[in-house]
């Protein structure tokens, strides 16, 4: 489930975090212990932060930025933006020339606006931070490289997220499955072994939501592709995609998917797992955080691991979160100093402990947050170390993003499992629909 979906969750997701006051105290302590460049008096820096699932993390970011400003003579205003509304608000701000001085964006929006020349390139700052902290993880480095589109790197990564495989150890281990499945075939086998409605083995969404696009990753792990290496000609119809559809149909026929999973909204898999009705789901760490607070027994019975692989290897996309500076900002130096400050290990350790992100810098894996005591962060560390760039092995471009937002692959899956179409007919439709989208970007 994406961060953008989380504001739609049922009430169990909106409970206040008891440690908010502690987070505020931590921010003050961090600011006192870290030096930052002095800045000119009388200016105001506006920062738009991305509102995430964790109230602790949101408050820590606000307090830390304001504390940095107070210590450096820079008036600050931090506005936390619901990520469902980020694109709308940023687009309006660009049109009205009212952008903040710095902000958080996801990779997709950053790439789109970077292509339009909205953001300052930050190659020197990217190198400085990387050199100071052991270098950037390869997946982060590749995913965040906007040079081809924007003439340079337009953002400084601060966290990665993506889907992990969540599993019920209490159901699987009595059946002899102590380790996470390494392949999608093994996943289907384990899911079938513990399938006992109303507890279903495989809580994967096959609906027209972001979670449904996990099926793209499964297809790619079987060797299927959306398009060619140039990112222009759609290549969905293939023997490799046929192999993926066979895997899907076989699992469906075993009855391992929960009823209604082809029409779930963005919270469907979350709710199934938290209600004890799914042995496996693919999701971000938000489900684990909810279970830890609201159902500690379920949390202790859960494990988090990387997505399985297929005949062509593991496809486990990371989504990189960026801090960017609009070119229109009159506070370029101050914004750069703030972003550098926010990359310091003390702040990031505190932030990782309460946020739902994995590390981006190699030195961060040595932070206390990733010492193994938090099973969610263990999974996110593995994602950071081994995750693949968005769309890999396909080309991540505007056409691919458009195809994803139209849920072409989940719709193909629905044709097979709900409408009973044969594989060729389903692939032909998906191929034609996707090519129509790609043709718009020629």
Predicted features along the sequence, with ranges:
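N-terminal secretory signal peptides
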Residues: 1-12, 23-30
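Short, solvent-exposed loop/beta-turn-alpha elements that line the ligand-binding surface or hinge
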Residues: 123-139, 206, 224-243, 292-300, ...
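Hinge/lid segment of periplasmic solute-binding proteins
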Residues: 107-162, 214-217, 303, 371-374, ...
């Amino acid at each position: 489930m994406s961060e953008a979906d989380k504001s739609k969750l049922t009430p169990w997701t909106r409970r206040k975090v008891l440690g908010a006051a502690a987070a505020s105290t931590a921010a003050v302590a961090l600011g006192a212990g870290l030096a930052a460049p002095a800045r000119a008096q009388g200016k105001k820096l506006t920062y738009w932060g991305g509102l995430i699932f964790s109230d602790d993390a949101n408050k820590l970011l606000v307090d830390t930025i304001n504390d940095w400003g107070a210590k450096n003579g820079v008036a600050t205003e931090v506005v936390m933006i619901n990520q469902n509304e980020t694109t709308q608000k940023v687009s309006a701000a660009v049109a009205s020339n009212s952008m903040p001085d710095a902000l958080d964006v996801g990779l997709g929006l950053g790439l789109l606006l970077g292509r339009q020349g909205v953001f300052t390139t930050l190659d020197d700052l990217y190198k400085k931070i990387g050199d100071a902290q052991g270098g950037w993880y390869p997946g982060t480095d590749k995913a965040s490289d906007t040079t081809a589109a924007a003439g340079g790197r337009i953002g400084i990564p601060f966290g990665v997220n993506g889907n992990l495989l969540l599993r019920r150890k209490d159901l699987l281990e009595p059946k002899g499955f102590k380790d996470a499945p390494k392949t999608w075939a093994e996943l289907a086998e384990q899911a079938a072994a513990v399938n006992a409605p109303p507890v279903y083995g495989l809580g994967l969404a096959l609906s027209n939501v972001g979670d449904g696009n996990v099926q793209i990753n499964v297809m790619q792990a079987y060797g299927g592709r959306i398009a060619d290496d140039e990112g222009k000609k759609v290549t969905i119809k293939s023997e490799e995609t046929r192999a993926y559809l066979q895997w899907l149909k076989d699992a469906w026929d075993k009855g391992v998917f929960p009823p209604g999973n082809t029409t779930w909204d963005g919270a469907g898999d979350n709710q199934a797992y938290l209600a004890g009705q799914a042995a496996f789901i693919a999701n971000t760490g938000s489900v684990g955080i909810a279970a830890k607070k609201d159902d500690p027994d379920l949390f202790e019975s859960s494990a988090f691991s990387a997505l399985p692989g297929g005949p062509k290897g593991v496809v486990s996309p990371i989504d990189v979160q960026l801090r960017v500076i609009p070119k229109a900002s009159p506070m370029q130096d101050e914004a750069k100093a703030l972003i550098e400050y926010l990359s310091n290990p003390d702040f990031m350790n505190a932030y990782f402990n309460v946020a739902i992100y994995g590390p981006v810098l190699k030195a961060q894996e040595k932070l206390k947050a990733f010492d193994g005591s938090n099973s969610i962060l263990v999974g996110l560390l593995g994602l950071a170390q081994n995750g693949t760039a968005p769309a890999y092995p396909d080309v991540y471009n505007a056409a691919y993003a458009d195809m994803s937002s139209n849920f072409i692959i989940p719709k193909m899956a629905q044709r097979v499992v709900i409408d009973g179409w044969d594989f060729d007919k389903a692939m032909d439709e998906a191929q034609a629909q996707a090519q129509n989208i790609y043709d718009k970007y020629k």
